[in-house]
C-alpha cells in the first residue's frame, strides 16, 4: 500500500494492513527470514531486519440505498459519501520488540437523506450526527523470541478472517500466540473498546468482554483447518453471555477448485437468561474453467443459521454470529462483497441462504461477479437480526410465511485504473425481491391476502488507493 524502506519494499506490505486471524495476524509483525532466489536479494543471503516500515491508503465509498422499508409510498432513499484516509507505522528497535500504530481519519457526508423517517413499526428515525473521526485502529506492542516459539501482543489490534465470518475489526487485547511449523495458535482476552481512542471526539466504551482460543493446521497443500472457542460477556446485559465453538476450513487443492466451510455451535446464555442451543453452517465451493477465455467460474454455496420456533420454553435455538463479523467475501474476483446479499446485508440468524455465483475476468485488471441468493426463514419472525432493511415480515394475520425472497447482485472490480497501479474501484449493485413473508395490508379490508412488498436496492461505488 505504500513505499517501505529501501530494498525490501514489498516484503512486509501485506503484514501492515492485512491482519487476518490467525494467519496474517500472527505474521503481521514478523520480519522476513530470508529472500527467495530472484526475489528480494541474492540467493542464500538473509534479508536484514527493517527497523521501521510504514504504509498509507485511502478509501472513498458512495452508498445509495433505496426502499429499505420495501414501500414505494414512503420516502427513505439515501445517498451517502464517506472518505477514509489511513496510515500505519511499525518500529522494531530490536529483533524481539515491535511497536505498531495505525490511525484512520474519516468522515461521512449525507448527499441525500430524509430528515425524518417513519418506520413500518411506527417508530420515528432521525438521521445520525456525522462528525469527523480520527481513530486509532491499532496501537500494539509485540514481544517475540524472548519465550520462543511464543509471542506476546498487548494493545489495540485488528482481527480479520478471509470471509469476515468471525472477525472484522479492532479490539483491545492481551494475547499469547504460538507458531511452529504447520501449527498456529492464539489465546487472548479482549474488550471491544476498552479505551476511547478517537482524537477528535469521545467514543463510548463497549462493555463486551471476550476470551478466545484459536488454532489452525496448515500441513495440507494450500488448505487450512481450524478450530476455536470464543466466549463473549456483555456487561451491559444487551447480548448475554454466548459461548461459540467453531470448526472452519478453506483451501485451494488445485488451480481450478477452491472451497470453504464454517460450522459453529452456540451455547451459553442470552440477554434474558435463556440457554443457547443453536448452530450455524456456511459451506461453498468455486470451480474455475481455466482453459476457457476470460477465466469463467461458478460458485455454489449454502448457509443456515438456526431459528427459534418456541421462544417461551427457556431455550434459545436462534443462532447468532459473534457480533464482530461483517460477512464480506469474494470468490475469484477482485472485489469483496456482502456474502448474504448487498441489499439484505444480514447476519446469519434464523435464515437459510442458497447462493449461485457466476464470475469472469474481463481483463487482467477487471473482474465480474453475478450472484443470486434465495432466502428462507427457519422460524416465523418479523425481522432478521442485524439486517439492513427496516421492513417487517409476517404482519398479516393468518398469512404467515417463511419465504423471505430473492436477491441478485452485480459486482465489478477494477485494479490499476488509468495506469495507476494502486488505484482501484469496486462497484456493487444489488436488488432484493421480497417474498410472501413481506406481504402487507393494502387498505382494502376485503383483500385479506394483502399486497406484495416493493423491491429494495443498493449501490456502492468504492474508490481505493
Per-range role (PLM):
Residues 112-138, 144-247, 314-357:
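Surface-exposed coil loops of outer-membrane beta-barrel proteins
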Residues 218-280, 284:
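Transmembrane beta-strand segments of outer-membrane beta-barrel domains in Gram-negative
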Residues 74-77, 161-170, 203, 266-278, ...:
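Outer-membrane beta-barrel proteins
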Residues 299-325, 383:
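A surface-exposed, glycine/aromatic-enriched loop/edge motif typical of exported proteins
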Residues 224-226, 258-260, 290-301, 308-312:
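Acidic/polar loop patches that form or flank catalytic/metal-binding clefts of enzymes
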Residues 1-35:
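Cleavable N-terminal export/targeting peptides
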Residues 59-61, 104-106, 190-192, 230-234, ...:
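Active-site beta-loop-alpha junctions enriched in small/polar residues
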Residues 27-152, 174, 178, 247-259, ...:
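Beta-barrel outer-membrane channel/assembly domains of diderm bacteria
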Amino acid at each position: 500500500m505504500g513505499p517501505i524502506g529501501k530494498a525490501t519494499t514489498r516484503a512486509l506490505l501485506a503484514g501492515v494492513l492485512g491482519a487476518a486471524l490467525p494467519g496474517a495476524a500472527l505474521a503481521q509483525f514478523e520480519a522476513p527470514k530470508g529472500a527467495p532466489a530472484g526475489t528480494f536479494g541474492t540467493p542464500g543471503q538473509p534479508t536484514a531486519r527493517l527497523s521501521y516500515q510504514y504504509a498509507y491508503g485511502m478509501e472513498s465509498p458512495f452508498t445509495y440505498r433505496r426502499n429499505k422499508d420495501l414501500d414505494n409510498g414512503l420516502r427513505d432513499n439515501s445517498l451517502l459519501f464517506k472518505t477514509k484516509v489511513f496510515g500505519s507505522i511499525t518500529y522494531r528497535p530490536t529483533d524481539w520488540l515491535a511497536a505498531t500504530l495505525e490511525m484512520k481519519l474519516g468522515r461521512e457526508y449525507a448527499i441525500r437523506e430524509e430528515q425524518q423517517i417513519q418506520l413500518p413499526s411506527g417508530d420515528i428515525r432521525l438521521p445520525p450526527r456525522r462528525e469527523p473521526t480520527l481513530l486509532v485502529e491499532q496501537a500494539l506492542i509485540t514481544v517475540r523470541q524472548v519465550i520462543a516459539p511464543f509471542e506476546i501482543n498487548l494493545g489495540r489490534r485488528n482481527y480479520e478472517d478471509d470471509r469476515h465470518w468471525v472477525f472484522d475489526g479492532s479490539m483491545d487485547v492481551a494475547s499469547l500466540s504460538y507458531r511452529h511449523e504447520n501449527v498456529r495458535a492464539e489465546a487472548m482476552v479482549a474488550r471491544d473498546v476498552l479505551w476511547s481512542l478517537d482524537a477528535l471526539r469521545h467514543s463510548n466504551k463497549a462493555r463486551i468482554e471476550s476470551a478466545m482460543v484459536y488454532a489452525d493446521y496448515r500441513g495440507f497443500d494450500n488448505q487450512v483447518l481450524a478450530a476455536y472457542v470464543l466466549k463473549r460477556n456483555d456487561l451491559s446485559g444487551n447480548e448475554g453471555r454466548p459461548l461459540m465453538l467453531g470448526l472452519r476450513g478453506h483451501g485451494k487443492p488445485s488451480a481450478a477448485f477452491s472451497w470453504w466451510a464454517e460450522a459453529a455451535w452456540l451455547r451459553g446464555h442470552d440477554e434474558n437468561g435463556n440457554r443457547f442451543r443453536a448452530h450455524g453452517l456456511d459451506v461453498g465451493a468455486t470451480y474455475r474453467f481455466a482453459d476457457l477465455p476470460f477465466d469463467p467460474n461458478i460458485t455454489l454455496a449454502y448457509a443456515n443459521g438456526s431459528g427459534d420456533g418456541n421462544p417461551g420454553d427457556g431455550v434459545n435455538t436462534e443462532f447468532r454470529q459473534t457480533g464482530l463479523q461483517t460477512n464480506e467475501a469474494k470468490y475469484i474476483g477482485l472485489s469483496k462483497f456482502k456474502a448474504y446479499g448487498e441489499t439484505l446485508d444480514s447476519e446469519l440468524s434464523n435464515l437459510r441462504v442458497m447462493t449461485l455465483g457466476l464470475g469472469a475476468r474481463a481483463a487482467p485488471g477487471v473482474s465480474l461477479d453475478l450472484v443470486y441468493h434465495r432466502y428462507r426463514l427457519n422460524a416465523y419472525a418479523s425481522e432478521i437480526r442485524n439486517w439492513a432493511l427496516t421492513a417487517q415480515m409476517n404482519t398479516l394475520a393468518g398469512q404467515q410465511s417463511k419465504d423471505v425472497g430473492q436477491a441478485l447482485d452485480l459486482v465489478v472490480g477494477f485494479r490499476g485504473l488509468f495506469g495507476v497501479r494502486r488505484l482501484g474501484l469496486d462497484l456493487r449493485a444489488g436488488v432484493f425481491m421480497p417474498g410472501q413473508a413481506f406481504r402487507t395490508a393494502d387498505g382494502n379490508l376485503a383483500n385479506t391476502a394483502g399486497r406484495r412488498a416493493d423491491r429494495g436496492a443498493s449501490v456502492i461505488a468504492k474508490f481505493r488507493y
